[in-house]
Amino acid sequence: MKPPKLSVIICVFNEEPNIRPLNKWINESITDIEYEIIYVDDGSTDRTRQEIIALNDPKVVLVEFRKNYGQSSALYAGIEQASGEYIVTMDGDLQNDPSDVPMMLKMAEDEGWDLVAGIRKNRQDGVFLRKLPSKIANSIIRNSTGVHIKDYGCTLKVFKSDLA
């Protein structure tokens, strides 16, 4: 069987109410591309795992951690499981728009880019607790690395799997 074009990796922790709407949103947004959805359950204590299993979606792969190891470990596990030519990373909290993925993939392919990174526009966190420190951190990272990504903290990214 031919591997999919995209592996969509979603690290989740206690995202039970978001699983069904997110999966539906992805399936409605990515229509002309072969893809798999890899949910990495990072030790959820709610019914996130059961919601993923109940999807009964042949595109879905579930990777389970027995306890919470954090997003970096979950992302690594998802990448290890991925079989797509490109990897998409996104959050499970419905703040990333899956309808951006086909456009981001097209940009990567047409422009020959290794990475296309999303930007959080309608963030649901507070200005002083999250947004301002994020702007400062993004500026420091840009200036110290010379890599100009507008929002390093945005999980929505598309990149070639051979770079992972």
Set out the residue ranges of the language-model regions.
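N-proximal low-complexity "stem/linker" segments adjacent to membrane-targeting elements
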Residues: 1-28
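Donor nucleotide-sugar binding loop of glycosyltransferases
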Residues: 15-18, 44, 71, 97
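Short beta-strand/loop segment that forms part of the nucleotide-sugar
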Residues: 23, 34-44, 63-64
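Alpha-helical transmission elements in cytosolic ATPase-linked domains
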Residues: 25, 47, 51-54, 77, ...
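Acceptor/aglycone-binding surface of glycosyltransferases and processive sugar-polymer synthases
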Residues: 65-67, 71-81, 86, 98-164
